[in-house]
Structures are given as C-alpha cells and as structure tokens.
From Swiss-Prot:
This is Uncharacterized protein AF_0397. Residues 1-22 form the signal peptide. It comes from Archaeoglobus fulgidus (strain ATCC 49558 / DSM 4304 / JCM 9628 / NBRC 100126 / VC-16). Keywords: Signal. It comes from the Archaea. The keyword Signal applies.
Length: 175
C-alpha cells in the first residue's frame, strides 16, 4: 500500500514540476502566411466610369473625369484590385461578405502622382457593384450592374471554396 502511495506522490510531484517548467518556458508561436488568392473563385474584369464631385469648384469633365480599369479577385471574403487612374497604376485590397453590402472604410486606391481615392464603402450584391470614395476634396461614386448569369455562377461557386472557376467576364459600369 505504501508503495502505491509513494508512486502516486512521485507522479504528482513530476506533474507539478512539469507544469512549473511549462509556465516558465516561452512558447514560440508560428504564424503561417495565408495565400488567400491561390485559388480565386472567379476573376472579374471591370471598367468603371464614374462621377467626381469636386465640392469646391465646378467639375471640368476634361480634367476631372475618373476612369478605373482593373481586376477584382473574389476569394471567400476578400477582394483585391489593380487599378489604373489617369495612366497611373495602383492597387487596393480589403474584406467583404461576398455578394452582400460590406464596409471597406479606410481602404485606399493608390494612384501614383495622381493622388489616391480613399474608399468609404464598396457594395457587392444583388447583381450590382457600387463604390463610394473620396478623391482630394471631392466625392467619387461608381456604380454598375453585374450580368445576371455570371452573378449566379459566382454565387454558386462561393459555397464551394475548393473549386476553381476560371470564368472571366467584362462589366461596363456607366453612369
């Protein structure tokens, strides 16, 4: 009986020592990089033409018109784009709930020496894409319709993240 009690006490002491050592030993956490765009569900080629409201002086269509061309890659809840504003390349990235209204506040479309558009919100859903942003002292509003057939195929592919849909389509966004 004494032998069993001795063994139990020894095990308990070893456990206490192990817990003490574990508490003193720093644990190194490794964060693996996420390759979120390795399997895009779809690639959307977009042409955006929008309104620039300068707020300060009347708009000069020759100089103030903003045109953005780029690619949006939708993968799960992320959107990434490459933009070209007045022949200046830029890019942006952010998160959204696919095909539902989503807040992109703080995301910036950087456009070289032409300045940048600070995105206030991007809405993707119900077959539409809308972008609200600030450009200098003015407001930018872009809006367009996503073709119904392509939108449905995108929505169906969103439920299967492992499937890759190489389907690409063009959306003209005109105001």
């Amino acid at each position: 009986m004494n032998r069993i009690v001795g063994i139990l006490i020894s095990i308990l002491m070893l456990a206490c020592i192990g817990v003490t050592m574990a508490a003193e030993t720093p644990v190194e956490a490794t964060i693996e990089p996420k390759n979120t765009f390795s399997e895009p569900l779809a690639t959307q080629m977009v042409l955006l033409k929008g309104i620039f409201d300068p707020k300060v002086e009347p708009m000069d269509p020759a100089n103030d018109a903003i045109e953005i061309t780029g690619v949006l890659k939708l993968n799960h809840n992320e959107v990434r784009g490459v933009v070209n504003i007045n022949n200046k390349k830029g890019e942006f990235a952010g998160k959204c709930t696919p095909f539902k209204s989503s807040n992109f506040e703080g995301v910036v479309l950087k456009c070289g020496s032409e300045g940048s558009i600070k995105v206030l919100q991007i809405n993707i859903g119900d077959g539409k894409l809308e972008l609200f942003g600030k450009y200098g002292d003015g407001i930018v509003f872009l809006e367009g319709k996503i073709p119904e057939m392509s939108y449905k195929s995108l929505a169906s592919s969103a439920s299967a993240p492992t499937s890759v849909r190489p389907e690409a389509w063009m959306v003209d966004i005109l105001l």
